[in-house]
C-alpha cells in the first residue's frame, strides 16, 4: 500500500466525510496531491489526524510528518511533502472553501 492509500484508508477508518483527492502537481511544484476531508467535531478531527500518523508509522513511513493545528483546531493540516492533508470540522470547511 502506498502513502496515499494509507492516508485515505486512515481517514475513512475514523469516519472522515466528503473525502476529496486533488492532483495539484500541475499547479504547484511542491505538492502532488491535496486531500480535503471533513469531520463532525474536534474530537473526530483529532482522531483522524492521530490515525494518519499512527498508520504511517506502522507502515514504516520514513518521511517527515509535519502538522499544523492542535487538539483545539478546527482545521488541521498534515504535510507529508508530496501529499498535503486538510482536515476540517465540517462548518470550518465551508468558511475556507478550498474545494
Regions found by a protein language model. Name each.
Residues 36-39:
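Short hydrophobic/aromatic beta-strand micro-patches
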Residues 1-30, 42-75, 90-92:
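Polybasic/polar functional segments that serve as interface/processing modules
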Residues 76-99:
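C-terminal structural segments of small proteins and small subunits
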Amino acid at each position: 500500500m502506498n502513502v496515499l492509500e494509507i492516508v485515505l484508508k486512515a481517514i475513512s477508518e475514523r469516519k472522515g466525510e466528503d473525502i476529496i483527492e486533488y492532483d495539484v502537481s500541475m499547479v504547484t511544484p511542491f505538492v502532488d496531491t491535496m486531500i480535503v476531508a471533513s469531520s463532525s467535531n474536534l474530537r473526530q478531527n483529532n482522531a483522524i489526524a492521530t490515525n494518519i500518523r499512527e498508520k504511517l508509522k506502522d507502515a514504516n513511513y520514513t518521511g517527515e510528518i509535519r502538522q499544523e493545528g492542535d487538539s483545539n483546531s478546527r482545521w488541521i493540516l498534515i504535510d507529508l511533502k508530496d501529499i498535503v492533508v486538510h482536515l476540517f470540522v465540517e462548518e470550518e470547511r465551508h468558511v475556507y472553501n478550498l474545494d
